[in-house]
């Protein structure tokens, strides 16, 4: 058995986004429920830990996955919780792969956290270029809540 940790919010402000990511992981697991390693076939089991969309809960959820002896971790939706949990995964030597956590700080200085998505600075540049080329825009206004990790 290969156990993959699912480090996602199923509750809190980002719960809806976390559930969408989990649906994708569940679909992939349903389509490919086994993996061949060194000539042996293993069943893949998803092990869930709700980080609650909260940095303090994220550390507890990360520790829970470490204690459940997962082989690697997928997640999370939301960079703030990924940044908070990063040291836990790093200290345990447990690889984590961020699916949509776009903040560069998620992987900075962490040999065990990786990502499969674009970084915030890249996305910002692409959007600015698009707005300028498509609409001749020269100014942009963003509204965001200072309380979210994306604006800090």
Locate predicted features:
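Short, surface-exposed alpha-helical segments at coil->helix boundaries
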Residues: 19-26, 55, 125, 151-152
